[in-house]
A protein has these predicted regions:
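Acidic/histidine-rich catalytic neighborhood of metal-dependent amide-processing enzymes
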Residues: 68-147, 180, 184, 188, ...
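Active-site metal-coordination/substrate-binding segment of hydrolases
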Residues: 29-97, 103, 389-401
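A non-catalytic alpha/beta surface segment that caps or lines the substrate-entry region
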Residues: 1-28, 52-53
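A generic structural motif
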Residues: 19-21, 173, 205-212, 293-296, ...
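Short beta-strand
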Residues: 10-14, 199-202, 282, 358-359
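Acidic-enriched catalytic cores of C-N bond-cleaving enzymes acting on peptides and small amides
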Residues: 132-159, 164-214, 218-280, 306-321
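An extended, acidic, His-containing surface patch that forms the Zn2+-binding/catalytic region
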Residues: 215, 219-289, 295, 299-310, ...
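Short coil/turn connectors at secondary-structure junctions
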Residues: 26-31, 49, 56-57, 89-93, ...
């Protein structure tokens, strides 16, 4: 907000939920929605640490450079360019910078509960060209409970991923009644993929096991290596007592087998020509001596319905002894023939030199559910930003191109 004010724009902090930046005091025609919050730093950074930005060969490394502070800055630069170059506008553009995109959208919901939608909305929180389809979400919570256990050997605790929309890079479990030698023998016989590693350490009455993998965005689970499902796979291979926790672990391995990224085992796998296939990441699980709670993150295509997604998953989980809570958040779809999308396409083609087209993603942005809203940039096609992972980066030249594209969009939508 301070930078926007320094650049001669009108900026305000709206009760800590969002920052709003206006180009003028006329009726608002265009909203640009970005966010300033970031995910956890994670591990595995090699170029720099997560919160020490570093420019190397035209790439700016650091957490949030691509998701989404860099793109927000590109939009702000576009607003400054329109102002500094003296273009006459008949309408206003408002940049809305949120603070809760990664953990629930409470910020943007708060804003639109109090302010009207704009006739046109874009979010620079994804890729170019135009994302006109954002898949739906089915992210239920399931639970099971049982009396205090005493049987040995058993799993007495399990801690999986910390975030619903992130493939877990770490998972830990305590196993009572087994030795490190027994567990290491099971690891050797398991044949797990090379990207997964296990460490075993002595603990009171047993061992502590940690699985390490690679995090990824929950909408693209195939790009990560799920430590949570890898650890469950190992636990199910151990000589555990026949008790409730063991039965739960075996059921979880059956319902969420390591490497199943499409919900095949839950009976949810499906796809359509416009939006592609369903994705699923089993991302959160806690287990104690008396119960467990888990969540998974599935992104549903346009063809996904209660009958083809929720009901099969509920039936499978309930048959395994779990209670289930959760509903489908429907997909977001703006027809490719919408005139606003044609305006965006022209601006993109003019400055990128590439042909525009519409695409579907599993990720969700602030425009999800906003009438006519689409995600538009700021990453160019083919660029690997490693968002949510180590060595997140943004291409500075592409960011400047994005700023030019957004400048043109502002002129086309809000100009005289």
């Amino acid at each position: 907000m301070a930078l926007a004010t320094e650049w001669g724009l009108t900026a305000q902090n709206l009760e800590g939920y969002v920052g709003a930046v206006d180009l003028n005091d006329r009726e608002t025609e265009l909203h640009i929605l970005g966010h300033l919050d970031v995910v956890d730093p994670g591990e595995g950074w090699t170029v720099t640490s997560a919160f020490e930005p570093k420019l190397v060969d035209g790439l700016l490394y650091g957490r949030g450079t691509d998701d989404d502070k860099g793109p927000v800055l590109a939009a702000l630069m576009a607003m400054r360019a329109v102002k500094d170059l003296g273009f006459s506008l008949k309408k206003n553009v408002r940049l809305i910078a949120g603070t809760d995109e990664e953990t629930g959208f409470r910020d943007i919901h708060w804003y639109y509960d109090r302010h009207p939608y704009a006739p046109h909305t874009i979010s620079p929180d994804a890729d170019f060209p135009i994302i006109n389809i954002e898949k739906g979400h089915y992210q239920p919570t399931f639970r099971a409970a049982w009396p205090q256990e005493a049987a040995l050997p058993r799993v007495s605790s399990f801690t999986g991923g910390p975030r619903l929309n992130m493939v877990p890079p770490k998972a830990q479990a305590t196993v009572l009644g087994l030795t490190a030698e027994q567990v290491n023998a099971a690891i050797a016989a398991l044949g797990m993929e090379a990207a997964i590693s296990y460490t075993v350490a002595p603990a009171e009455g047993g061992v502590r096991i940690q699985a390490s993998g690679q995090n990824a965005h929950g909408s693209t689970p195939e790009e990560g290596h799920n430590a949570q499902t890898a650890l469950l796979t190992l636990l199910a291979a151990l000589p555990l007592a026949d008790c409730p926790s063991t039965q739960v672990i075996q059921n979880l391995v059956r319902l969420f087998p390591h490497g199943d990224h499409i919900g095949q085992a839950l009976g949810m796998a499906q796809s359509d020509d416009l939006s592609g296939g369903l994705s699923l990441a089993f991302t959160m699980l806690t287990l104690t001596d008396t119960g467990c709670e888990g969540r998974f993150d599935s992104r549903t295509p346009l063809c996904g319905t209660d009958a083809t997604v929720r009901l099969p998953a509920e039936a499978a989980l309930q048959a395994a002894g779990f209670t289930v809570e959760g509903e489908i958040d429907p997909p977001h779809h703006v027809p490719a023939t919408d005139p606003f999308l044609q305006t965006l396409a022209c601006a993109y083609e003019l400055y990128s030199g590439r042909e525009s087209h519409c695409i579907a993603i599993g990720g969700g942005t602030y425009v999800h559910g906003i009438p006519g809203g689409v995600a538009f940039g700021a990453s160019m096609p083919g660029f690997v930003s490693n968002l949510h992972g180590p060595d997140e980066r943004v291409n500075v030249a592409d960011l400047l191109t994005a700023a030019m594209i957004y400048t043109q969009v502002i002129l086309d939508v809000c100009g005289e």
